[in-house]
Amino acid sequence: MRLSRFFLPILKETPKEAEIVSHRLMLRAGMMRQEAAGIYAWLPLGLRVLKKIEAIVREEQNRAGAIELLMPTLQLADLWRESGRYDAYGPEMLRIQDRHKRELLYGPTNEEMITEIFRSYVRSYKSLPLNLYHIQWKFRDEQRPRFGVMRGREFLMKDAYSFDIDEVGARLSYNRMFVAYLRTFARMGLKAIPMRAETGPIGGDLSHEFIVLAETGESGVYIDKDVLDLPVPGTDVDYDGDLTPIVKQWTTAYAATEDVHDGARYEREVPEERRVHTRGIEVGQIFYFGTKYSESMKALVAGPDGVEQPIHGGSYGVGVSRLVGAIIEACHDDAGIKWPEAVAPFTVAILNLKQGAGDTDAACERLYRELSAKGVDVLYDDTDQRAGAKFATADLIGIPWQVMVGPKGLAEGKVEIKRRGDGTRENVALEDAVERLMA
Protein backbone atom coordinates (compact mmCIF):
# COMPACT_ATOMS: atom_id res chain seq x y z
CA MET A 1 0.00 0.00 0.00
CA ARG A 2 1.31 3.42 -0.96
CA LEU A 3 0.87 5.91 1.86
CA SER A 4 -0.02 8.60 -0.68
CA ARG A 5 -3.14 6.54 -1.51
CA PHE A 6 -3.93 5.34 2.01
CA PHE A 7 -6.32 7.00 4.45
CA LEU A 8 -4.26 7.69 7.58
CA PRO A 9 -5.54 10.73 9.52
CA ILE A 10 -2.69 11.24 12.00
CA LEU A 11 -3.43 13.63 14.88
CA LYS A 12 -0.64 15.93 16.03
CA GLU A 13 -2.16 16.46 19.47
CA THR A 14 -3.68 14.00 21.89
CA PRO A 15 -7.44 14.46 22.45
CA LYS A 16 -8.23 15.53 26.01
CA GLU A 17 -10.73 12.71 26.59
CA ALA A 18 -8.07 10.02 26.13
CA GLU A 19 -7.02 8.87 29.60
CA ILE A 20 -4.81 5.83 28.93
CA VAL A 21 -1.98 5.09 26.52
CA SER A 22 -3.90 2.81 24.15
CA HIS A 23 -6.76 5.29 23.78
CA ARG A 24 -4.35 8.15 23.10
CA LEU A 25 -2.28 6.21 20.58
CA MET A 26 -5.24 4.73 18.73
CA LEU A 27 -6.68 8.21 18.20
CA ARG A 28 -3.36 9.81 17.32
CA ALA A 29 -2.39 7.00 14.94
CA GLY A 30 -5.65 7.35 13.01
CA MET A 31 -6.87 3.89 13.96
CA MET A 32 -10.35 4.91 15.05
CA ARG A 33 -12.68 7.84 15.56
CA GLN A 34 -15.18 8.30 18.37
CA GLU A 35 -18.75 8.63 17.08
CA ALA A 36 -20.52 8.59 20.45
CA ALA A 37 -19.59 7.74 24.04
CA GLY A 38 -17.99 4.29 23.90
CA ILE A 39 -18.76 3.84 20.18
CA TYR A 40 -16.01 4.06 17.56
CA ALA A 41 -15.59 3.97 13.81
CA TRP A 42 -12.67 1.72 12.89
CA LEU A 43 -10.50 3.52 10.35
CA PRO A 44 -8.38 1.57 7.82
CA LEU A 45 -5.24 1.19 9.97
CA GLY A 46 -7.20 0.05 13.02
CA LEU A 47 -9.34 -2.28 10.97
CA ARG A 48 -6.26 -4.02 9.58
CA VAL A 49 -5.11 -4.79 13.13
CA LEU A 50 -8.60 -5.90 14.15
CA LYS A 51 -8.75 -8.30 11.19
CA LYS A 52 -5.31 -9.75 12.02
CA ILE A 53 -6.41 -10.44 15.59
CA GLU A 54 -9.71 -11.89 14.43
CA ALA A 55 -7.89 -14.24 12.04
CA ILE A 56 -5.64 -15.60 14.79
CA VAL A 57 -8.62 -16.16 17.08
CA ARG A 58 -10.47 -17.96 14.28
CA GLU A 59 -7.51 -20.17 13.37
CA GLU A 60 -6.98 -21.31 16.95
CA GLN A 61 -10.69 -21.97 17.52
CA ASN A 62 -10.78 -24.08 14.38
CA ARG A 63 -7.62 -25.90 15.42
CA ALA A 64 -9.25 -26.79 18.74
CA GLY A 65 -12.28 -28.27 16.97
CA ALA A 66 -14.78 -25.44 17.39
CA ILE A 67 -17.17 -24.79 14.49
CA GLU A 68 -17.99 -21.27 13.34
CA LEU A 69 -21.47 -19.87 12.79
CA LEU A 70 -22.90 -16.36 13.01
CA MET A 71 -25.74 -15.25 15.24
CA PRO A 72 -27.60 -11.94 14.87
CA THR A 73 -26.96 -8.93 17.07
CA LEU A 74 -30.66 -8.63 17.98
CA GLN A 75 -32.31 -11.28 20.17
CA LEU A 76 -35.85 -11.95 21.32
CA ALA A 77 -36.53 -10.90 24.90
CA ASP A 78 -38.63 -14.05 25.39
CA LEU A 79 -35.50 -16.22 25.14
CA TRP A 80 -33.94 -14.33 28.02
CA ARG A 81 -37.12 -14.56 30.06
CA GLU A 82 -37.01 -18.31 29.53
CA SER A 83 -33.55 -18.51 31.10
CA GLY A 84 -34.46 -16.05 33.85
CA ARG A 85 -31.78 -13.55 32.90
CA TYR A 86 -33.94 -10.86 31.30
CA ASP A 87 -34.79 -9.22 34.61
CA ALA A 88 -31.50 -10.20 36.24
CA TYR A 89 -29.49 -8.16 33.75
CA GLY A 90 -29.25 -4.50 34.65
CA PRO A 91 -29.55 -1.33 32.57
CA GLU A 92 -26.39 -2.19 30.65
CA MET A 93 -28.57 -4.39 28.41
CA LEU A 94 -30.15 -2.32 25.64
CA ARG A 95 -33.84 -3.21 25.35
CA ILE A 96 -35.80 -2.15 22.28
CA GLN A 97 -39.10 -2.73 20.46
CA ASP A 98 -39.71 -3.19 16.77
CA ARG A 99 -42.65 -1.64 14.89
CA HIS A 100 -44.86 -4.55 15.93
CA LYS A 101 -44.12 -3.88 19.62
CA ARG A 102 -42.13 -7.10 19.93
CA GLU A 103 -39.52 -6.84 22.63
CA LEU A 104 -35.95 -7.30 21.50
CA LEU A 105 -32.53 -6.71 22.98
CA TYR A 106 -29.12 -5.93 21.57
CA GLY A 107 -27.24 -9.01 22.72
CA PRO A 108 -24.53 -8.53 25.33
CA THR A 109 -23.92 -12.31 25.20
CA ASN A 110 -25.44 -15.34 23.46
CA GLU A 111 -26.00 -18.24 25.86
CA GLU A 112 -29.77 -18.19 25.35
CA MET A 113 -29.69 -17.99 21.57
CA ILE A 114 -27.09 -20.72 21.12
CA THR A 115 -29.09 -22.95 23.48
CA GLU A 116 -32.19 -22.31 21.36
CA ILE A 117 -30.26 -23.26 18.21
CA PHE A 118 -28.88 -26.38 19.86
CA ARG A 119 -32.19 -27.65 21.21
CA SER A 120 -33.85 -27.14 17.83
CA TYR A 121 -31.57 -29.62 16.09
CA VAL A 122 -29.65 -31.89 18.47
CA ARG A 123 -31.52 -34.83 19.96
CA SER A 124 -28.94 -37.48 20.84
CA TYR A 125 -25.70 -37.77 22.80
CA LYS A 126 -24.20 -39.21 19.60
CA SER A 127 -23.99 -35.65 18.23
CA LEU A 128 -21.80 -34.60 21.18
CA PRO A 129 -19.39 -33.14 22.05
CA LEU A 130 -20.13 -29.98 20.08
CA ASN A 131 -18.49 -26.56 20.24
CA LEU A 132 -19.98 -23.68 18.24
CA TYR A 133 -18.53 -20.17 18.07
CA HIS A 134 -19.06 -16.86 16.38
CA ILE A 135 -17.31 -13.50 16.13
CA GLN A 136 -19.85 -10.71 16.37
CA TRP A 137 -20.36 -7.14 17.51
CA LYS A 138 -22.04 -6.67 20.88
CA PHE A 139 -23.39 -3.79 22.89
CA ARG A 140 -23.43 -3.14 26.62
CA ASP A 141 -24.70 0.22 27.78
CA GLU A 142 -21.87 0.99 30.19
CA GLN A 143 -22.78 3.76 32.60
CA ARG A 144 -19.38 5.34 32.19
CA PRO A 145 -17.63 4.19 29.02
CA ARG A 146 -13.97 5.14 29.11
CA PHE A 147 -10.48 4.07 28.12
CA GLY A 148 -11.34 3.77 24.42
CA VAL A 149 -11.84 0.19 23.25
CA MET A 150 -10.91 -1.11 26.70
CA ARG A 151 -14.31 -0.22 28.11
CA GLY A 152 -16.50 0.77 25.21
CA ARG A 153 -20.19 0.18 24.70
CA GLU A 154 -19.91 -1.50 21.30
CA PHE A 155 -17.24 -4.18 20.95
CA LEU A 156 -16.26 -7.22 18.90
CA MET A 157 -16.28 -10.55 20.73
CA LYS A 158 -15.53 -14.16 19.98
CA ASP A 159 -17.99 -16.36 21.86
CA ALA A 160 -17.78 -20.14 21.85
CA TYR A 161 -20.25 -22.51 23.47
CA SER A 162 -19.63 -26.17 24.26
CA PHE A 163 -22.24 -28.89 24.70
CA ASP A 164 -21.53 -32.22 26.42
CA ILE A 165 -23.53 -35.10 27.82
CA ASP A 166 -22.00 -34.88 31.30
CA GLU A 167 -19.62 -32.94 33.52
CA VAL A 168 -16.65 -35.13 32.62
CA GLY A 169 -17.03 -34.32 28.94
CA ALA A 170 -17.73 -30.65 29.66
CA ARG A 171 -14.49 -30.30 31.59
CA LEU A 172 -12.60 -31.83 28.67
CA SER A 173 -14.16 -29.17 26.42
CA TYR A 174 -13.20 -26.53 28.99
CA ASN A 175 -9.60 -27.74 28.89
CA ARG A 176 -9.52 -27.53 25.09
CA MET A 177 -10.52 -23.89 25.19
CA PHE A 178 -8.09 -23.22 28.05
CA VAL A 179 -5.20 -24.48 25.91
CA ALA A 180 -6.52 -22.78 22.76
CA TYR A 181 -6.51 -19.47 24.63
CA LEU A 182 -2.91 -19.93 25.74
CA ARG A 183 -1.93 -20.42 22.10
CA THR A 184 -4.13 -17.59 20.81
CA PHE A 185 -2.65 -14.89 23.01
CA ALA A 186 0.92 -16.16 22.63
CA ARG A 187 0.61 -15.87 18.85
CA MET A 188 -0.25 -12.21 19.33
CA GLY A 189 2.95 -11.64 21.28
CA LEU A 190 1.17 -11.55 24.64
CA LYS A 191 1.79 -13.41 27.87
CA ALA A 192 -1.76 -13.98 29.08
CA ILE A 193 -1.97 -15.61 32.50
CA PRO A 194 -5.04 -17.68 33.40
CA MET A 195 -6.46 -16.76 36.81
CA ARG A 196 -9.40 -18.25 38.70
CA ALA A 197 -12.35 -15.88 38.43
CA GLU A 198 -15.88 -15.20 39.61
CA THR A 199 -18.58 -16.39 37.22
CA GLY A 200 -20.87 -13.35 37.56
CA PRO A 201 -24.12 -13.26 35.57
CA ILE A 202 -22.96 -16.06 33.25
CA GLY A 203 -23.31 -18.53 36.11
CA GLY A 204 -21.61 -21.79 37.04
CA ASP A 205 -18.83 -22.60 39.48
CA LEU A 206 -15.70 -22.76 37.30
CA SER A 207 -14.13 -19.87 35.43
CA HIS A 208 -10.73 -18.51 34.45
CA GLU A 209 -9.84 -15.04 33.24
CA PHE A 210 -6.86 -14.57 30.95
CA ILE A 211 -4.95 -11.52 32.12
CA VAL A 212 -2.25 -9.56 30.28
CA LEU A 213 0.07 -7.77 32.67
CA ALA A 214 0.14 -4.01 32.16
CA GLU A 215 0.66 -1.18 34.63
CA THR A 216 -2.43 0.55 33.27
CA GLY A 217 -4.66 -2.50 33.72
CA GLU A 218 -8.02 -2.23 35.45
CA SER A 219 -7.42 -5.13 37.86
CA GLY A 220 -4.82 -5.63 40.55
CA VAL A 221 -3.15 -9.04 40.23
CA TYR A 222 -0.95 -11.19 42.44
CA ILE A 223 1.20 -13.85 40.83
CA ASP A 224 4.06 -16.24 41.42
CA LYS A 225 6.83 -15.08 39.07
CA ASP A 226 7.37 -18.68 37.96
CA VAL A 227 4.14 -18.56 35.95
CA LEU A 228 5.77 -16.08 33.57
CA ASP A 229 8.21 -18.75 32.36
CA LEU A 230 5.72 -21.52 31.65
CA PRO A 231 5.84 -22.92 28.08
CA VAL A 232 2.91 -22.39 25.74
CA PRO A 233 1.72 -25.52 23.89
CA GLY A 234 2.93 -25.77 20.29
CA THR A 235 1.06 -26.40 17.06
CA ASP A 236 1.39 -30.13 17.65
CA VAL A 237 -0.83 -30.07 20.75
CA ASP A 238 -3.31 -32.97 20.64
CA TYR A 239 -6.75 -31.54 21.36
CA ASP A 240 -8.20 -35.05 21.37
CA GLY A 241 -5.73 -36.17 24.00
CA ASP A 242 -5.49 -35.52 27.74
CA LEU A 243 -4.85 -31.81 28.25
CA THR A 244 -5.14 -31.99 32.03
CA PRO A 245 -1.34 -31.85 32.61
CA ILE A 246 -1.12 -28.58 30.66
CA VAL A 247 -4.04 -27.03 32.52
CA LYS A 248 -2.66 -28.22 35.86
CA GLN A 249 0.77 -26.80 35.07
CA TRP A 250 -0.74 -23.38 34.35
CA THR A 251 -3.06 -23.35 37.35
CA THR A 252 -0.76 -24.71 40.06
CA ALA A 253 1.41 -21.62 40.52
CA TYR A 254 -0.39 -18.82 42.35
CA ALA A 255 -2.11 -16.25 40.11
CA ALA A 256 -5.18 -14.28 41.15
CA THR A 257 -6.96 -11.00 40.59
CA GLU A 258 -7.62 -8.82 43.62
CA ASP A 259 -11.28 -9.91 43.59
CA VAL A 260 -10.40 -13.46 44.62
CA HIS A 261 -6.92 -12.93 46.08
CA ASP A 262 -6.14 -15.02 49.17
CA GLY A 263 -3.45 -13.08 51.00
CA ALA A 264 -2.73 -15.80 53.55
CA ARG A 265 -2.29 -18.47 50.88
CA TYR A 266 -0.15 -16.13 48.78
CA GLU A 267 2.27 -15.51 51.62
CA ARG A 268 2.26 -19.17 52.58
CA GLU A 269 2.89 -20.61 49.10
CA VAL A 270 4.96 -17.98 47.30
CA PRO A 271 8.45 -17.01 48.53
CA GLU A 272 8.87 -13.26 48.84
CA GLU A 273 11.41 -13.07 46.01
CA ARG A 274 8.86 -14.61 43.60
CA ARG A 275 5.90 -12.42 44.54
CA VAL A 276 4.70 -10.02 41.85
CA HIS A 277 1.94 -7.51 42.56
CA THR A 278 0.99 -5.49 39.51
CA ARG A 279 -2.02 -4.73 37.35
CA GLY A 280 -3.52 -6.52 34.40
CA ILE A 281 -6.06 -6.41 31.58
CA GLU A 282 -8.62 -9.14 31.04
CA VAL A 283 -8.61 -10.26 27.39
CA GLY A 284 -10.66 -13.44 27.68
CA GLN A 285 -12.72 -15.52 30.09
CA ILE A 286 -13.97 -19.09 30.03
CA PHE A 287 -16.82 -20.64 32.02
CA TYR A 288 -18.23 -24.06 32.83
CA PHE A 289 -21.83 -23.53 33.91
CA GLY A 290 -23.19 -27.07 33.88
CA THR A 291 -26.93 -27.32 33.27
CA LYS A 292 -27.79 -23.70 34.14
CA TYR A 293 -29.29 -22.94 30.73
CA SER A 294 -30.21 -26.41 29.52
CA GLU A 295 -32.48 -27.07 32.51
CA SER A 296 -34.37 -23.78 32.33
CA MET A 297 -34.60 -23.87 28.53
CA LYS A 298 -35.19 -27.62 28.20
CA ALA A 299 -32.14 -28.33 26.04
CA LEU A 300 -32.28 -32.11 26.40
CA VAL A 301 -30.64 -35.00 24.57
CA ALA A 302 -31.22 -38.72 24.80
CA GLY A 303 -28.39 -40.44 26.64
CA PRO A 304 -27.01 -43.95 25.98
CA ASP A 305 -29.94 -45.38 27.96
CA GLY A 306 -32.47 -43.48 25.86
CA VAL A 307 -33.48 -41.21 28.73
CA GLU A 308 -33.50 -37.48 28.03
CA GLN A 309 -31.21 -35.34 30.14
CA PRO A 310 -30.01 -31.71 30.15
CA ILE A 311 -26.69 -31.07 28.48
CA HIS A 312 -23.68 -29.59 30.29
CA GLY A 313 -22.46 -26.34 28.82
CA GLY A 314 -19.58 -23.91 28.82
CA SER A 315 -18.94 -20.52 27.26
CA TYR A 316 -15.67 -19.00 26.17
CA GLY A 317 -15.17 -15.33 25.32
CA VAL A 318 -12.34 -13.33 23.78
CA GLY A 319 -12.52 -9.55 23.53
CA VAL A 320 -11.30 -9.13 19.95
CA SER A 321 -11.57 -5.34 19.80
CA ARG A 322 -10.40 -5.04 23.41
CA LEU A 323 -7.26 -6.95 22.46
CA VAL A 324 -6.20 -4.09 20.19
CA GLY A 325 -6.01 -1.80 23.21
CA ALA A 326 -4.49 -4.47 25.44
CA ILE A 327 -1.66 -5.14 23.00
CA ILE A 328 -0.87 -1.43 22.80
CA GLU A 329 -0.86 -1.14 26.59
CA ALA A 330 1.69 -3.96 26.72
CA CYS A 331 3.69 -2.91 23.62
CA HIS A 332 4.49 0.79 23.35
CA ASP A 333 7.08 3.43 24.15
CA ASP A 334 7.18 7.22 24.18
CA ALA A 335 7.30 7.34 20.37
CA GLY A 336 4.24 5.21 19.77
CA ILE A 337 3.04 1.64 19.27
CA LYS A 338 5.34 -1.38 18.96
CA TRP A 339 3.14 -3.98 17.26
CA PRO A 340 4.06 -7.65 17.52
CA GLU A 341 4.56 -8.75 13.93
CA ALA A 342 1.59 -11.15 13.88
CA VAL A 343 -0.96 -8.37 14.47
CA ALA A 344 0.75 -5.37 12.87
CA PRO A 345 -1.28 -3.48 10.24
CA PHE A 346 1.76 -3.66 7.98
CA THR A 347 4.92 -5.71 8.47
CA VAL A 348 7.37 -3.41 6.67
CA ALA A 349 7.44 0.34 6.13
CA ILE A 350 9.58 1.64 3.28
CA LEU A 351 10.57 5.25 3.90
CA ASN A 352 11.67 7.18 0.82
CA LEU A 353 13.88 9.87 2.34
CA LYS A 354 14.14 11.89 -0.89
CA GLN A 355 10.92 11.53 -2.78
CA GLY A 356 11.31 12.56 -6.41
CA ALA A 357 14.98 11.63 -6.69
CA GLY A 358 15.40 9.03 -9.41
CA ASP A 359 17.71 6.66 -7.53
CA THR A 360 15.74 6.60 -4.27
CA ASP A 361 12.43 6.30 -6.11
CA ALA A 362 13.74 3.37 -8.15
CA ALA A 363 15.18 1.58 -5.10
CA CYS A 364 11.96 2.01 -3.13
CA GLU A 365 9.85 0.80 -6.04
CA ARG A 366 12.06 -2.26 -6.37
CA LEU A 367 11.77 -3.12 -2.67
CA TYR A 368 8.04 -2.47 -2.68
CA ARG A 369 7.50 -4.67 -5.70
CA GLU A 370 9.66 -7.57 -4.48
CA LEU A 371 8.28 -7.62 -0.93
CA SER A 372 4.69 -7.38 -2.14
CA ALA A 373 5.29 -10.28 -4.53
CA LYS A 374 6.35 -12.39 -1.55
CA GLY A 375 3.11 -11.65 0.28
CA VAL A 376 4.55 -9.14 2.75
CA ASP A 377 2.21 -6.38 3.97
CA VAL A 378 4.15 -3.25 2.96
CA LEU A 379 3.40 0.41 3.59
CA TYR A 380 5.45 2.53 1.21
CA ASP A 381 5.79 6.11 2.40
CA ASP A 382 5.99 7.84 -0.95
CA THR A 383 4.75 11.18 0.36
CA ASP A 384 6.70 14.43 0.15
CA GLN A 385 6.95 14.77 3.93
CA ARG A 386 10.37 15.52 5.39
CA ALA A 387 12.41 12.57 6.69
CA GLY A 388 11.81 13.40 10.36
CA ALA A 389 8.05 13.36 9.88
CA LYS A 390 8.26 9.99 8.13
CA PHE A 391 10.29 8.53 11.00
CA ALA A 392 7.77 9.85 13.52
CA THR A 393 4.80 8.43 11.62
CA ALA A 394 6.39 5.00 11.24
CA ASP A 395 7.21 4.89 14.95
CA LEU A 396 3.77 6.14 15.98
CA ILE A 397 1.84 3.54 13.99
CA GLY A 398 4.25 0.84 15.10
CA ILE A 399 5.31 -0.93 11.90
CA PRO A 400 7.72 -3.72 13.06
CA TRP A 401 10.33 -3.16 10.32
CA GLN A 402 11.34 0.15 8.78
CA VAL A 403 13.54 0.40 5.69
CA MET A 404 15.12 3.83 5.24
CA VAL A 405 16.14 4.55 1.67
CA GLY A 406 18.13 7.74 1.13
CA PRO A 407 20.71 9.11 -1.30
CA LYS A 408 23.56 8.91 1.22
CA GLY A 409 23.12 5.19 1.81
CA LEU A 410 22.40 4.40 -1.82
CA ALA A 411 25.68 6.06 -2.78
CA GLU A 412 27.26 3.06 -1.06
CA GLY A 413 24.61 0.65 -2.35
CA LYS A 414 22.99 0.30 1.08
CA VAL A 415 19.73 0.89 2.92
CA GLU A 416 19.13 1.06 6.66
CA ILE A 417 16.78 -1.40 8.38
CA LYS A 418 15.33 -0.59 11.79
CA ARG A 419 13.50 -3.00 14.04
CA ARG A 420 10.76 -1.09 15.86
CA GLY A 421 10.54 -3.49 18.79
CA ASP A 422 14.02 -2.87 20.19
CA GLY A 423 15.28 0.00 18.04
CA THR A 424 18.19 -1.95 16.56
CA ARG A 425 19.49 -0.72 13.21
CA GLU A 426 21.69 -2.22 10.53
CA ASN A 427 22.93 -1.22 7.12
CA VAL A 428 22.49 -3.85 4.42
CA ALA A 429 23.13 -3.95 0.72
CA LEU A 430 20.09 -3.01 -1.32
CA GLU A 431 20.11 -6.37 -3.11
CA ASP A 432 20.12 -8.19 0.27
CA ALA A 433 17.37 -6.16 1.95
CA VAL A 434 14.45 -8.36 0.91
CA GLU A 435 16.23 -11.53 2.00
CA ARG A 436 17.09 -9.91 5.35
CA LEU A 437 13.49 -8.89 5.96
CA MET A 438 12.21 -12.36 5.05
CA ALA A 439 14.65 -14.13 7.40
Curated annotation (Swiss-Prot):
EC number: 6.1.1.15
Biological role: Catalyzes the attachment of proline to tRNA(Pro) in a two-step reaction: proline is first activated by ATP to form Pro-AMP and then transferred to the acceptor end of tRNA(Pro).
Subunit organization: Homodimer.
Matches recorded under SUPFAM superfamilies: Class II aaRS ABD-related (SSF52954), Class II aaRS and biotin synthetases (SSF55681)
Top EC class of this enzyme: ligase
Highest taxon, organism lineage: Bacteria
One biological process term in Gene Ontology: prolyl-tRNA aminoacylation
Keyword Phosphoprotein attached: no
UniProt cross-references to Pfam families, sorted A to Z: HGTP_anticodon, tRNA-synt_2b
Family assignment from sequence similarity: Belongs to the class-II aminoacyl-tRNA synthetase family. ProS type 2 subfamily.
Name assigned to this protein: Proline--tRNA ligase
GO molecular function: ATP binding; proline-tRNA ligase activity
Catalytic reaction(s) noted: tRNA(Pro) + L-proline + ATP = L-prolyl-tRNA(Pro) + AMP + diphosphate
Matching NCBIfam families: PRK12325.1, proS_fam_II
Keyword Cytoplasm: yes
